From Swiss-Prot:
GO terms for molecular function: 3-isopropylmalate dehydrogenase activity; magnesium ion binding; NAD binding. InterPro entries: IsoCit/isopropylmalate_DH_CS, IsoPropMal-DH-like_dom, Isopropylmalate_DH. This is 3-isopropylmalate dehydrogenase. GO terms for biological process: L-leucine biosynthetic process. The lineage of its organism: Eukaryota, Fungi, Dikarya, Basidiomycota, Agaricomycotina. Its cofactor is Mg(2+); Mn(2+). Its main location: cytoplasm.
């Protein structure tokens, strides 16, 4: 029987993106080689700043079409000072356009410690950071980032600029229902909905709809509400109060997910996934049995260390594990990747040489990738 093909589009991006994605790609190649019934087909495309330099735009029609036809997408990182906020064309525009085109409405990002040995690298005191286990679910394609806007100097009122934050009942229902994408222990994780309902009309709608959706569809879940300014203080003062699932809109989620992600001490350690509800294209060429998803590490492009080979690839490798974990045929390889990462981490606890510079070590990006691949090959 011939192997089924699983197409993954690789978007290395900018800065350290190509370096960390290369190690995750090696891991996916090992998974493909070990499978008797599924073959992973990898296809690389320019995205972000490198696409601007080569093609004059951050997301070409060819790259977008490839992403639409893919089963999953693995992204490195985009951006850098070369394409600053005053540039007419910016790498971040590619990410927003991709999210909109693929219907990527929910971003899931964890913030936790793989080991207490990492507590020393947290910016918070160990007594405050120990035991933090937060998952941020952020709405991705609504709110101020996608509302009507006017730039300074454009049209009437040339001395003013604005952005509009709009949410509808279906949009809030959809992101609230995405809570089911997070595996729950027994008892289930509590949900902390974050808004600014004391000021914003869109937040009052958010709070009302989130409450009704949880009560009507997930009555077993414990739900509470926090104002965004209060939640941002809790994340640095007593983050364990927000253990569980943080559910919030686009702008607040952008800020809070970044704030919570630094608690574990290194942005290079954690993965994330952006989810679509269903395939969005009616024509046969774009049909898939499951919605597209984008997987990426939580860190940025880190241009200050790009090209030095010292970036931590663990977050990207774990993003590849998340990618595999969404397919029933690859649940076992996904767990094997996670176990290989844990094995490499344990060796790092004993030997500083298996830690990258962000964790006080001296190992290279490729050293970490090689060790993970070595352990994975022995397991699969």
């Amino acid at each position: 029987m011939s192997k089924r093909t699983f197409k993954i589009v690789i978007l290395p991006g900018d800065g350290i993106g190509p370096e960390v994605v290369a190690e995750a790609t090696r891991v996916l190649e090992v998974v493909s080689a070990s499978s008797s019934d599924v073959e992973i087909k990898l296809e690389t495309h320019d995205f972000g700043g490198c696409s601007i330099d080569k093609h004059g735009e951050p997301l070409t029609a060819a790259t977008l079409e490839a992403c639409k036809l893919a089963d999953a997408i693995l992204l490195g990182a985009i951006g850098g000072p070369k394409w600053g906020v005053n540039s007419k064309v910016r790498p971040e525009q590619a990410l927003l356009a991709l999210r909109k085109a693929l219907g990527l409405y929910a971003n899931i990002r964890p913030a936790n410690f793989a080991s207490d040995s990492l507590l020393a690298y947290s910016p918070l005191k160990p007594s405050v950071a120990r035991g933090v286990d937060i998952i941020v679910i952020r709405e991705l394609i609504g709110g101020a980032y996608f509302g009507e806007r006017k730039e300074l100097g454009a049209r009437a009122q040339e001395d003013a600029a604005w952005d509009t934050m709009i949410y509808s009942v279906p949009e809030v229902q959809r992101i609230t229902r995405s809570r089911r994408q997070v595996a729950s222990p027994d008892p289930p994780l509590p949900v902390h909905s974050i808004d600014k309902a004391n000021v914003l009309a869109s937040s009052r709608l958010w709070r009302k709809v989130a409450t009704e959706t949880i009560q009507n569809e997930f009555p077993q879940l414990k739900l509470d509400h926090h104002l965004v300014d209060s939640a941002s203080m809790l994340i640095v003062a007593n983050p364990k109060k927000l253990n569980g699932v943080i559910l919030t809109e686009n702008l607040f989620g952008d800020i809070l997910s970044d704030e919570s992600s630094v608690i574990p001490g290194s942005l290079g350690l954690l993965p994330s996934a952006s989810l679509a509800a269903r395939p969005l294209w009616p024509n046969t060429a774009h049909r898939r049995s499951s919605p597209r998803r984008v997987y990426e590490p939580i860190h940025g492009s880190a241009p200050d260390i790009a090209g030095q080979g010292i970036a931590n690839p663990i977050g990207t490798i774990l993003s590849a594990a998340m990618l595999c974990g969404t397919r029933s045929v690859w649940r076992s390889p996904a767990k094997a990747i996670e176990a290989a990462v844990e094995g490499a981490r344990r060796q790092g606890d004993r030997r500083e040489g298996l830690r990258t510079a962000d964790l006080g070590g001296s190992s290279k990006t490729k050293d970490i990738g090689h060790k993970v691949v070595e352990i994975l090959k022995a397991t699969l």
